[in-house]
UniProtKB/Swiss-Prot annotation:
UniProt protein name: Photosystem I assembly protein Ycf3
Plastid listed as a keyword: yes
Cell compartments where the protein resides: Plastid, Chloroplast thylakoid membrane
Entry-linked PANTHER family: CELLULOSE SYNTHASE OPERON PROTEIN C, TPR REPEAT-CONTAINING PROTEIN MJ0263
Species of origin: Buxus microphylla (Littleleaf boxwood)
Gene symbol of the encoding locus: ycf3
Signal peptide: none
InterPro entries: PSI_Ycf3_assembly, TPR-like_helical_dom_sf, TPR_rpt, Ycf3/AcsC/BcsC/TPR_MFPF
Chief location category: plastid
Keyword terms: Chloroplast, Membrane, Photosynthesis, Plastid, Repeat, Thylakoid, TPR repeat
Length: 168
C-alpha cells in the first residue's frame, strides 16, 4: 500500500489527493509518475522522522526521475536527511548535486553554509584557527550565494557576514 494512503495527517492526505489528481490529468510518462510517487512517499516518511524509509524512496525516485529540476529537490531532501543524521560530508555532497541541477536553491546554499560554519566552530574549539578560518570563509561564500538569490532572507547570515568582515 502506498505510504500516502496510510498517513493520518490531514495536510499530507490533502497533498496526496491533489497530487493524485494532478498525476491523472497532467500528461506524464509512467516513469515520471512512478518517480513522483516515490518522492511523495519519501516526503511523507521524512515528515514522520522515518529517515531510512524516506531515503529508500528518494533513492528510487532519483533512479526514475529524468528531469534535472525535479531531481534537484529529491537530492536536496536526501541532503536534509543526512544533515539531520549528522552525516555532514554526505549532506554537502547531496546539496552540491542538487545545485548542479538547479542553481537557484538558496536553501541548499544556506544549509551548506550552516554545515561549514559548524565545522569552523568545531575547529575553533579544537584550537585550529587556520582550519576554522577556511571553513568560515567557505560558509561566507555559500551564504553570499543564498542571499544573492533571495535578498531580504537569511538576515542572521547577513549580519554574521558584516560582523566578521566577510560582506562585500
Amino acid at each position: 500500500m502506498s505510504r500516502s494512503r496510510i498517513n493520518g495527517n490531514f495536510i499530507d492526505k490533502t497533498f496526496s489527493i491533489v497530487a493524485n489528481i494532478l498525476l491523472r490529468i497532467i500528461p506524464t510518462t509512467s516513469g515520471e509518475k512512478e518517480a513522483f510517487t516515490y518522492y511523495r512517499d519519501g516526503m511523507s516518511a521524512q515528515s514522520e522522522g522515518n529517515y531510512a524509509e524516506a531515503l529508500q524512496n528518494y533513492y528510487e525516485a532519483t533512479r526514475l526521475e529524468i528531469d534535472p529540476y525535479d531531481r534537484s529537490y529529491i537530492l536536496y531532501n536526501i541532503g536534509l536527511i543526512h544533515t539531520s543524521n549528522g552525516e555532514h560530508t554526505k549532506a554537502l555532497e547531496y546539496y552540491s548535486r542538487a545545485l548542479e541541477r538547479n542553481p537557484f536553491l538558496p536553501q541548499a546554499f544556506n544549509n551548506m553554509a550552516v554545515i561549514c560554519h559548524y565545522r569552523g566552530e568545531q575547529a575553533i574549539r579544537q584550537g585550529d584557527s587556520e582550519i576554522a578560518e577556511a571553513w568560515s570563509d567557505q560558509a561566507a561564500e555559500y551564504w553570499k550565494q543564498a542571499i544573492a538569490l533571495t535578498p531580504g532572507n537569511y538576515i542572521e547570515a547577513h549580519n554574521w557576514l558584516k560582523i566578521t568582515g566577510r560582506f562585500e
